[in-house]
C-alpha cells in the first residue's frame, strides 16, 4: 500500500499584469534547445578525454576525478530543484542553471591545472541537474502524449550527436581541446539569452505555474523520498544514465586507443552512436503507442544487450554502436513519462525532480567506477562492464513493473 501524499492548497504564480496569450512553441523551443546544450556539454568530453589525459599526464583512473567532482552538484540539484522552482519559479531557476553551466564549461577551457577542472566539475553537475529536472517537470506537467517527452529527449540526442561531431571536426581543423570547450561554452551561453528574454517579457507559459507553496514543496519532497517506487525509479535511471555516460565518455577511448581505429573514424563512430540514439528518441511516440511503455522498455533492454555483446565480441563491425544508441534511447523518457501514473499528482514535480537529478549521479559514479576498473583490467573490459550494467537495468525494471501503477 502506498502512503498518502501530503495535502494542502497550492499557489499559482502569475504576472500581476494580464497579457495576451503567448505562443506555446516558444517555451517548447527553449526547452528543446536547453536539452541540446546539456547533450553537447556532456558528450563532447568523450572525444576530448585522450587530449586531457595527455595534457595533465593522467591515467584512466585519475581522470575519473573529473567525473567524481560532478557528484556534489548533481546531489545538490537532486534535493533542491523542486524547492528552488517553487520559490523562484521555473524561468529564474533555468537562468541560474544556464549561467552556472556556461561558467563551468568556459572554465574547463581556461584551466591551467588539473585541480581547477576537478573543482569546477561541481558547477557543471549543478547546472545540468537543474536544467534537466526543471525542463522535465515543465514538459510532463503540460503534456498528455508521449510524443512531447520523446521529442524533448530526442533533442538531447541531437546535442549528444553534435558534441562528438563538433569536437572531432574542430580537432581535425587544428584547434586544441581548450578551444573546443570555448566553442561549446558559446553554444551553451545562447541559452542564457533565451531564458533572460522569457523573464524580461514575462512569457506566460514558463512564468505561470501551479506549484506547491514552499512548505508543501518540502513536504512533497519528503513524501517522494519515502515512496519505494520513486527510490527504485531513481536507482534504475541512475544506472541508465550511467550507462549512457559510460558509452559517451569511454567508447571513443576504446575505439581509438585500445583498438587503434583512426581518430577521425573513431570520433564519427561515436556520433553514429548518438544518431541511433536520436532516431530512437524521435520514434518514441510511435513505439509507445504500438507496444506500450512497459513492453518498449523490455524490448529496449533486450536490444541493448545484443548490441553490447556484438560491440564486445565483434569489434571490427560498424552496426553495434548505432544499435546500442537506438536501444537505450527510449528507456529514460519512457520511465519519466510513467511517473505520473506511479505516484500521486501532488508529488509528481518532486518525484521527477528527484529521480532526474539522482539519475544524473550515474553520469559521474558509473563512468568513474569503469575507469578505475579499466585502469587495472584494460580498456577492453569496458564493453563487458557496460553489458553487466544492462543486465542490472533489466533486474531493476522488473522490480518497477512489479510495483505497478496507481489505480485511482
Q: How should these model regions be labeled?
A:
Residues 345-379, 386:
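A late C-terminal transmembrane helix in Major Facilitator Superfamily
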Residues 120-155:
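Cytoplasmic helix-loop-helix junction between adjacent transmembrane helices
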Residues 57, 89, 110-112, 260, ...:
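Helix-breaking motifs and short loop linkers at transmembrane-helix boundaries and internal kinks
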Residues 45-46, 227-271, 278-279:
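Extracytoplasmic gate region of multi-pass secondary transporters
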Residues 76-115:
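Conserved MFS/SLC helix-loop-helix module at the cytosolic interface between two early adjacent transmembrane helices
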Residues 151-203:
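Helix-loop-helix hairpin linking two adjacent transmembrane segments in secondary transporters
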Residues 291-338:
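C-terminal transmembrane helical hairpin of 12-TM major facilitator-type secondary transporters
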Amino acid at each position: 500500500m502506498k502512503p498518502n501524499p501530503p495535502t494542502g492548497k497550492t499557489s499559482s504564480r502569475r504576472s500581476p499584469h494580464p497579457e495576451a496569450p503567448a505562443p506555446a512553441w516558444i517555451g517548447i523551443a527553449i526547452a528543446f534547445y536547453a536539452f541540446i546544450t546539456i547533450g553537447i556539454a556532456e558528450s563532447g568530453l568523450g572525444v576530448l578525454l585522450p587530449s586531457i589525459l595527455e595534457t595533465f599526464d593522467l591515467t584512466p583512473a585519475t581522470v575519473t576525478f573529473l567525473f567524481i567532482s560532478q557528484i556534489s552538484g548533481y546531489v545538490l540539484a537532486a534535493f533542491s530543484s523542486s524547492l528552488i522552482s517553487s520559490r523562484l519559479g521555473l524561468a529564474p531557476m533555468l537562468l541560474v542553471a544556464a549561467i552556472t553551466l556556461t561558467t563551468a564549461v568556459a572554465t574547463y577551457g581556461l584551466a591551467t591545472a588539473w585541480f581547477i577542472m576537478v573543482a569546477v566539475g561541481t558547477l557543471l553537475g549543478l547546472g545540468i541537474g537543474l536544467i534537466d529536472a526543471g525542463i522535465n517537470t515543465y514538459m510532463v506537467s503540460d503534456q498528455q502524449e508521449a510524443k512531447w517527452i520523446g521529442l524533448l529527449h530526442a533533442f538531447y540526442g541531437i546535442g549528444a550527436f553534435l558534441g562528438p561531431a563538433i569536437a572531432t571536426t574542430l580537432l581535425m581543423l587544428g584547434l586544441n581541446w581548450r578551444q573546443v570547450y570555448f566553442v561549446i561554452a558559446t553554444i551553451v551561453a545562447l541559452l542564457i539569452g533565451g531564458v533572460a528574454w522569457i523573464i524580461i517579457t514575462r512569457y506566460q507559459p514558463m512564468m505561470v505555474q501551479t506549484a506547491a507553496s514552499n512548505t508543501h514543496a518540502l513536504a512533497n519532497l519528503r513524501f517522494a523520498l519515502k515512496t519505494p517506487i520513486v527510490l527504485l525509479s531513481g536507482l534504475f535511471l541512475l544506472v541508465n544514465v550511467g550507462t549512457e555516460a559510460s558509452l559517451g565518455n569511454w567508447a571513443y577511448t576504446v575505439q581509438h586507443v585500445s583498438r587503434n581505429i583512426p581518430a577521425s573514424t573513431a570520433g564519427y563512430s561515436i556520433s553514429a552512436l548518438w544518431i541511433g540514439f536520436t532516431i530512437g528518441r524521435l520514434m518514441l511516440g510511435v513505439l509507445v503507442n504500438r507496444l506500450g511503455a512497459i513492453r518498449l522498455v523490455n524490448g529496449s533492454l533486450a536490444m541493448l544487450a545484443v548490441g553490447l555483446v556484438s560491440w564486445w565480441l565483434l569489434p571490427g563491425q560498424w552496426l553495434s554502436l548505432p544499435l546500442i544508441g537506438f536501444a537505450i534511447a527510449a528507456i529514460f523518457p519512457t520511465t519519466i513519462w510513467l511517473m505520473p501514473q506511479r505516484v500521486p499528482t501532488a508529488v509528481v514535480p518532486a518525484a521527477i525532480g528527484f529521480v532526474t537529478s539522482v539519475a544524473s549521479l550515474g553520469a559521474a559514479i558509473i563512468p568513474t567506477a569503469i575507469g578505475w576498473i579499466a585502469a587495472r583490467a584494460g580498456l577492453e573490459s569496458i564493453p563487458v562492464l557496460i553489458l553487466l550494467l544492462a543486465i542490472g537495468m533489466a533486474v531493476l525494471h522488473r522490480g518497477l513493473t512489479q510495483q505497478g501503477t496507481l489505480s485511482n
